[in-house]
């Protein structure tokens, strides 16, 4: 399979640069993965699509204000995007500057907010491929506190505008809990507290995994054949409680519904681990990095339904959706979404998909 197989034409005006003020009012394209049928709905209709006893799996990661602006000691401007927090004072980051900082170079962060010559001092300790290991010089202040003071919400590049005060709330799920993501698990942005309460009242069960979404989620696939692509790693936590709930749901004949591709990758990583290590259970606890890459031809061991946004052309995320719903069904649904002027990407509209259990490759 070629990357170009997953391309589609998207008018620029369909890229959502601001969210809906009412989270549940976005549009919802329902796709039957078994036969390709499409229904046009509103997101609040998920209440009618999810049954009593079904299990919703959410990703409770919380987006950190991971983008910082500053300068090198030489005076050159830098933009720092935290990729992963290593401890309270060290982090891995992408750094944009005219010249990459060398090991031992001093950085002064946050001068856009703190004023010239008042930046927070940090040191570039080492380079790991495309990432820079950076350490705060002042050990009396934790990294999260620094980010809350000087950081900007790391809006995706396609939103193409500076972050605003409202993004601190809008680019965050209402159930986010564990800080560490540099991109939101965007399918969850459509749920508000009222909808969650209605789902609970209906008898729908909830469980939470944690996958700290990295900036790699926006990186293009740079190979021609998708089988040659090396997936970026992200940290995942799937607890025993989550595993027990999934097993009980399956035994009861109910559905496991993943909210977002990150929830899919978390659950399927834990299920793949169980299979590879000969665990007789369907799934086992998982606390590790995952580089799982799901594309057409790969099987799904756990997930029955998927709630997801509309993704970038030629991205690993549209490949995952194609594996889940079938390639032809997915590309046809995207064609319909463009024709019907759905809003795309992080602040855009959503899909509700039930799995095609028979797909193989580009079918």
From Swiss-Prot:
Pathway: tRNA modification; tRNA-queuosine biosynthesis
Enzyme class (EC, first level): transferase
Reactions the enzyme catalyzes: 7-aminomethyl-7-carbaguanosine(34) in tRNA + S-adenosyl-L-methionine = epoxyqueuosine(34) in tRNA + adenine + L-methionine + 2 H(+)
GO biological process: queuosine biosynthetic process; tRNA wobble guanine modification
Domain of life: Bacteria
Pfam families, sorted: Queuosine_synth (PF02547)
EC number from the UniProt entry: 2.4.99.17
InterPro entries reported for this sequence: QueA (IPR003699), QueA_dom1 (IPR042118), QueA_dom2 (IPR042119), QueA_sf (IPR036100)
Keyword Kinase tagged: no
Keyword Cytoplasm appears in the UniProt entry: yes
Gene Ontology terms for molecular function: S-adenosylmethionine:tRNA ribosyltransferase-isomerase activity
GO cellular component, one term: cytoplasm
PANTHER family: S-ADENOSYLMETHIONINE:TRNA RIBOSYLTRANSFERASE-ISOMERASE
Family listed: Belongs to the QueA family.
Entry function: Transfers and isomerizes the ribose moiety from AdoMet to the 7-aminomethyl group of 7-deazaguanine (preQ1-tRNA) to give epoxyqueuosine (oQ-tRNA).
Protein name per the record: S-adenosylmethionine:tRNA ribosyltransferase-isomerase
Organism this protein belongs to: Haemophilus influenzae (strain PittGG)
